[in-house]
A protein has these predicted regions:
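A short beta-strand motif characteristic of beta-propeller blades
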Residues: 238-251, 299-308, 345-367, 405-421, ...
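Repeated scaffold domains used in trafficking and secretory/extracellular systems
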Residues: 253-263, 310-322, 361-381, 422-434, ...
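Short loop/turn segments immediately following beta-strands, especially the blade-tip
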Residues: 232-238, 293-295, 337-347, 399-408, ...
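Conserved beta-propeller blade signature
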Residues: 218-222, 265-268, 324-328, 384-388, ...
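A short loop-to-beta-strand structural motif that recurs across blades of beta-propeller domains
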Residues: 227-229, 286-291, 333-336, 394-398, ...
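Blade-level signature of beta-propeller repeat domains, shared across WD40, Kelch, NHL, RCC1
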Residues: 513-550
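Extracellular/lumenal mature domains of secreted and surface-exposed proteins
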Residues: 20-216
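Short glycine/acidic-enriched loop and turn motifs that connect beta-strands
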Residues: 225-227, 272-277, 331-334, 391-394, ...
Length: 550
């Protein structure tokens, strides 16, 4: 028993000894408030730029006195009290000053030198192919003037160097290639490669917008994960010239399902990242908006934003007249705002944003469409609204303003019109009033053309107009972007009323015999043509005014 007590005492003593061991503390070294400095660019005319090659004056303003050590973040150091330094490469640098054992740091961003290009025509004339000459001006803000730049210009195919007829290639080496003409319509991209002091700078590109000699209408379209593009509907391009799209330099957005053109303004309806069902429990997943873009892409304004609100209220589809811009959400109804309004934030508590029409305010509700029937394109023709649905009662439905109920309808008993293409996935349609034809695209089937006379005859007997094969004029299949009942499909169609042509963007299904691109249904030849190939378009719009450029 005594032995056990001794063992226990030994254990306690060992534990006590181990508890007395001291660990070395960890010391953190922090910048001192007593050490400070400022810096500025001394090159005249470059004071705000902080470019590669700039002379930067560092000034010690510390409260402490003593020997100074500067570390400039690029591996260079100095022990001068107030040194100057030049950075040879762009980047974010951490500058450190140590005085008497204390230190401080400050970040310094050095920007790279990059030339700028300006393209000009005499008297600011519109540049058209094979005629109007373009001159280029290059500016290089280079604080280290001793280093001379070397320029190489890469010009687009079809460029003629008027002042250098001996050059037949698309490359010019020198400060300025002189006067240029272009033989192809569209955005002609010029690339400038610059070497300065033996170092290659970032390539600079300039788009010269080259128009057509034949005044033509302009077709706009939004490219998936790309930009807003424009295309001249000129089918009489001179031999040897090509007609390519214009890049407006404006991002299309996440899902710009509809474009609307009115009074020289292109309205872009982008329903945002989330366009299919989502459990938006916090009602804050919305990120859709309507943007007004100048016809040449030179400016843009926010018309309406739903950012931070309910996702299902994002603007999906639209229609515009001389006074109002109408926009449909995902599956509830259509709202409207003035065409000239800007910088609006959608607020469903504000009576200004009350619905113009809702699913449950028409006699179609519950008979045949259901709660939350998915919206699609809509239009007003000769005083009558046409509204496409893709799910929960697919088809095209019609109503007049007077058919809109002022109270909710639990189940409709007297629909105002028979249905066009009942139970079909109809995302887009357009009506040719001159030739009295309704064109519509049905998913997995293709383009249908229905004489309005047939629809009127069916209306007289209260019979739905079905998607009979006799109306199918072109077969194709879209990709599966989206989900069941909410596929993006062909999301918009436009009509050129002057010749009856119908245009739309097709993102073809993989393996489809009909390629992706901007399509034209030519009623004269009854053929589906590819106008612009190799693009994945969403919304599309037409400027009916003819011009050489935009």
């Amino acid at each position: 028993m005594k032995a056990l007590r001794n063992i226990g005492l030994t254990v306690v003593l060992l534990a006590s000894l181990s508890a007395c061991v001291e660990n070395d503390p960890t010391y953190n070294v922090y910048p001192s408030d007593d050490v400070a400095f400022t810096y500025c660019v001394t090159n005249e005319g470059y004071e705000l730029d902080y470019l590669v090659g700039s002379t930067i004056q560092f000034t010690n303003t510390s409260a402490l006195s003593g020997a100074c050590t500067w570390e400039f973040g690029d591996g260079e150091t100095s022990t001068e009290p107030n040194p100057t330094h030049t950075y040879n490469l762009p980047g974010q640098y951490e500058v450190k000053l140590t005085v008497g054992g204390e230190f401080t740091t400050r970040p310094l961003l050095i920007n790279d030198i990059k030339p700028t290009i300006v393209a000009k025509t005499e008297n600011d004339a519109v540049c058209v192919i094979n005629d109007v000459e373009v001159t280029l001006e290059v500016t290089l803000r280079n604080p280290a003037a001793s280093a001379q730049p070397e320029y190489t210009w890469v010009l687009p195919e079809g460029t003629t160097l008027v002042d250098h007829p001996e050059i037949t290639s698309n490359t010019y080496v020198g400060e300025n290639p002189g006067r240029l003409t272009f033989k192809n319509i569209g955005s002609q991209t010029i690339t400038l490669k610059t070497t300065l002091g033996g170092r290659a700078l970032q390539d600079v590109k300039a788009n010269v917008q080259v128009g057509t000699p034949n005044a033509s209408k302009t077709l706009y379209y939004a490219v998936k994960s790309g930009n807003i593009m424009a295309y001249k509907l000129d089918y009489n391009v001179p031999e040897g010239s090509s007609n390519s799209p214009f890049d407006l330099g404006v991002k299309s957005g996440a899902h710009p399902l509809n474009l609307l053109f009115h009074n020289d303004i292109l309205y872009v309806l982008d329903c945002g990242t989330q366009f299919t069902y989502i459990n938006d429990t916090e009602n804050n997943r919305g990120d859709g908006k309507i943007t007004a873009v100048a016809k040449d892409g030179s400016s843009m304004e926010t018309v309406l934003s739903n950012v931070g609100n309910t996702a299902f209220n994002d603007p999906f589809y639209g229609w515009i007249d001389s006074e109002m811009l109408y926009f449909a959400d995902r599956n509830t109804g259509i709202r409207r705002i003035g065409v000239n309004e800007r910088n609006l934030a959608l607020n469903t508590s504000d009576a200004k944003f009350d619905y113009f029409v809702m699913n449950n305010r028409l006699e179609y509700y519950g008979n045949p469409w259901q709660y939350g029937a998915m919206n699609a394109c809509f239009a007003k023709v000769d005083g009558l609204w046409y509204w496409g649905k893709t799910y929960g009662g697919g088809g095209i439905y019609r109503f007049a303003d007077s058919d809109i109920s002022t109270v909710d309808i639990s189940r409709g008993s007297n629909p105002p019109y028979a249905v066009i293409f009942p139970d079909e996935f109809v995302k887009s349609f357009v009506i040719d009033t001159n030739n009295q034809i309704l064109y519509a695209i049905i998913r997995d089937k293709g383009l249908f053309a229905v004489p309005m006379a047939d629809i009127s005859a069916n209306d007289a007997s209260k019979t739905n107009t079905k998607a009979d094969n006799k109306y199918l004029v072109a077969s194709f299949k879209s990709d599966s972007d989206g989900s069941t009942g909410e596929f993006v499909d062909v999301c918009q169609m436009v009509l050129d009323s002057s010749d009856g042509s119908v245009y739309f963007g097709l993102r073809a299904d993989e393996g489809s015999t009909e390629p992706s691109g901007i399509k034209r249904w030519n009623p004269a030849t009854r053929q589906l043509e590819t106008v612009v190939s190799g693009v994945s378009p969403y919304g599309i719009a037409l400027n009916d005014n003819v011009s050489n450029l935009f």
